Amino acid sequence: MSAIVLVDAENVRRSVWPNLSREELVERVERWAEREGVHAQVVFEGRGETADDRIVAKTAELHAQGEEVWVATSDRELRERVEPCVDRIIGGGSFARML
């Protein structure tokens, strides 16, 4: 079973490349995930729902299914919210540099 990595898109993008397009971020994450042998989901803000709330809900869902879950963010509040359900938290800047 490979890990599922949930990426806080705006947090990661702002960490290193504030002008990077959404598409380029997704492409970089997809290439990284393929190299690392993990599954990745880049999470953006949605209609009426923050990316943070979407990440928290998805993390809880995946954890309940017994999946290995990582979250990439430097957002302190988000890190605290997902900590009980994740196997690894990667800082946004650190994650961006891995891409």
Model regions and ranges:
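Nuclease catalytic cores that cleave nucleic-acid phosphodiester bonds
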Residues: 2-99
